[in-house]
Amino acid sequence: MEALVYTFLLVGTLGIIFFAIFFREPPRIVK
């Protein structure tokens, strides 16, 4: 169960960093 929690936290942190970089730059993909 601990491994599942660690993987969840890892994916969560990576997701937050990805969204931070994505929203920081102008979203060209939408247009």
From Swiss-Prot:
Top-rank taxon, per record: Eukaryota
Keywords: Chloroplast, Membrane, Photosynthesis, Photosystem II, Plastid, Thylakoid, Transmembrane, Transmembrane helix
Keyword Membrane assigned: yes
Main subcellular localisation: plastid
InterPro entries per the UniProt record, alphabetical: PSII_PsbT (IPR001743), PSII_PsbT_sf (IPR037268)
Topology of this chain in the membrane: Single-pass membrane protein
Subcellular location: Plastid, Chloroplast thylakoid membrane
Pfam families per UniProt: PsbT
Segments crossing the lipid bilayer: 3-23
Keyword Zinc-finger: no
One GO term of the biological process aspect: photosynthesis
Purpose of the protein: Found at the monomer-monomer interface of the photosystem II (PS II) dimer, plays a role in assembly and dimerization of PSII. PSII is a light-driven water plastoquinone oxidoreductase, using light energy to abstract electrons from H(2)O, generating a proton gradient subsequently used for ATP formation.
PANTHER family: PHOTOSYSTEM II REACTION CENTER PROTEIN T, PTHR36411
Self-association state and partner proteins as the record states: PSII is composed of 1 copy each of membrane proteins PsbA, PsbB, PsbC, PsbD, PsbE, PsbF, PsbH, PsbI, PsbJ, PsbK, PsbL, PsbM, PsbT, PsbY, PsbZ, Psb30/Ycf12, at least 3 peripheral proteins of the oxygen-evolving complex and a large number of cofactors. It forms dimeric complexes.
Family: Belongs to the PsbT family.
Protein name: Photosystem II reaction center protein T
Species of provenance: Chlorella vulgaris
